[in-house]
Every structure is written in C-alpha cells, then in structure tokens.
From Swiss-Prot:
UniProt GO BP: chaperone cofactor-dependent protein refolding
UniProt KW Magnesium keyword: no
NCBIfam families according to UniProt: PRK00364.1-2 (NF001527), PRK00364.1-5 (NF001529), PRK00364.2-2 (NF001531), PRK00364.2-4 (NF001533)
SMART domains given in the database record: Cpn10
PANTHER family: 10 KDA HEAT SHOCK PROTEIN, CO-CHAPERONIN GROES
Subunit structure as annotated in this protein's UniProt entry: Heptamer of 7 subunits arranged in a ring. Interacts with the chaperonin GroEL.
GO MF assignments: ATP binding; metal ion binding; protein folding chaperone; protein-folding chaperone binding; unfolded protein binding
Alphabetized InterPro entries for the sequence: Chaperonin_GroES, Chaperonin_GroES_sf, Chaprnonin_Cpn10_CS, GroES-like_sf
The name this protein goes by in its record: Co-chaperonin GroES 2
Amino acid sequence: MKFRPLHDRVVVKRIDAEEKTAGGIIIPDTVKEKPSQGEVIAVGPGGRDESGKLIPIDVRVGDRVLFGKWSGTEVKIDTQELLIMKESDIMGVLADVSSKKKAA
C-alpha cells in the first residue's frame, strides 16, 4: 500500500538503537528506550500560511531525522511500524550518518 501524508505531515520509520554501548556493555531490551531517530519515508506537500500560500516542507524522503520521545502517532502500514508526525515535531536532520564517532 502506498501512503501519502497530507499537509505538513511526515512519515518516519524508527531506526533501532544500538545494542551495546561504546564501552561494550550490552543493553537489554527491558531498559532500552524507543529510538528518537528515524528515516523519512514520505512527506506531505506542506502547510499553508494565513494567505493560503503553500509552505514547502524542509525534510526530504531519505533524510535521517531526530525527534522528541513522544512525537508523532504510531501506525502500522503493510506490517511496518511507522510514525506520522508534523514537521514541527522534527528537531533536526542528521547531516552525515555514514561516519561514526568514536568514544572519548
């Protein structure tokens, strides 16, 4: 099924958190928090200002974004767990996700 969000909505797929810390400690599922990072799957056309002019969305499909712990509404589409949120719930876009930082 193809899903097209409306207005300033964004569909995000959560990216799983790391299974262990930088020091090598394995994090059990019982204490793991939901990841607040995800990949943008679909975006709406944008919101409208007071005059009715379309304001385009800043994020694009494929962007890796950070969002608040309680942001969005969880939905299941084609067996995939996804989040639908407003663009304003997104805190920022991760610029370079290919390089990993080393622990200090």
